[in-house]
């Protein structure tokens, strides 16, 4: 698991510096143990069988955190780069000055907050979806607001520096960075929380899933995501199977995840 430390609760937190940022062997052991009960289905089952097995596993191992607790973990340990600074999802960057990311300065500056890859309005701000760390990411307030509750897609529209492209006509948003991350976060959500996505025009539909699958293939899993995945298991209990086994994206039948 990921090791972290803080010198004081109001001091900047540095986590996983250098080679300790992502412990590959420890993560592999965690992964193998986590999926051991469904491994046979993952290898031999059909798309619906795999979906149902993963849905049961992700749900039974999920600890429902308060939103406050989830964000505390997100900012302090989960969304950190190898140098210990925060990572912004849609720009692929973060604060250059570590003073920006300590608790008091964050509240005073108000320059970043919590982005829900699956917007809160799609699931009426209900828990456990609201605090599910696998689709929560740190983002600049301005960029988070610009994305609003728009669907993720490749679009032409207003370009926002270090953020993305917004198409206000079709209610769509294309991030500047993080396309692989948002694809895998959305696929996780469809498996973990079925029935909340796809019943309104602004939401991801089965047709839109094709674009996410393309991003998933085009932008492979990074050590940042692996660090997130293992660290989230520490605090929330479950994992994102599309980070652990990227090939599952082509095997899972996601139809059961969409609202009817």
Give the role of each language-model region:
Residues 101-260:
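Domain-level detector of nuclease and nuclease-like folds
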Residues 1-92, 248-260:
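N-terminal module-boundary/linker segments of secreted carbohydrate-active enzymes
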């Amino acid at each position: 698991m990921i090791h972290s430390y803080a010198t004081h609760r109001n001091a900047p937190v540095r986590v996983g510096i250098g080679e300790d940022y992502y412990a590959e062997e420890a993560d592999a052991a965690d992964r193998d143990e986590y999926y051991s009960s469904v491994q046979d289905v993952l290898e031999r089952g059909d798309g619906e069988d795999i979906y149902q097995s993963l849905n049961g596993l992700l749900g039974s191992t999920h600890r429902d955190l308060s939103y406050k607790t989830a964000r505390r973990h997100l900012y302090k340990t989960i969304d950190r780069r190898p140098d210990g600074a925060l990572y912004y999802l849609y720009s692929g960057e973060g604060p250059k000055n570590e003073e920006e990311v300590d608790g008091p300065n964050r509240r005073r500056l108000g320059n970043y907050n919590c982005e829900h890859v699956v917007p809160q309005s799609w699931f009426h701000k209900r828990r456990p979806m609201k605090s599910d760390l696998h689709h929560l990411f740190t983002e600049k307030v301005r960029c988070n607001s610009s994305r609003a509750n728009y669907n993720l897609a490749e679009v032409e529209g207003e370009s926002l520096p270090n953020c993305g492209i917004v198409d206000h006509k079709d209610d769509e948003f294309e991030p500047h960075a993080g396309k692989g991350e948002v694809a895998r976060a959305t696929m996780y959500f469809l498996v973990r929380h079925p029935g909340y996505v796809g019943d309104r025009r602004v939401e991801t539909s089965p047709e839109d899933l094709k674009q996410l699958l393309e991003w998933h293939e085009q932008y492979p899993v990074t050590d940042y995501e692996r660090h997130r995945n293992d660290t989230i298991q520490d605090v929330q209990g479950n994992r994102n199977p599309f980070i652990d086994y990227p090939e599952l994206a082509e095997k899972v039948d996601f139809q059961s995840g969409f609202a009817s």
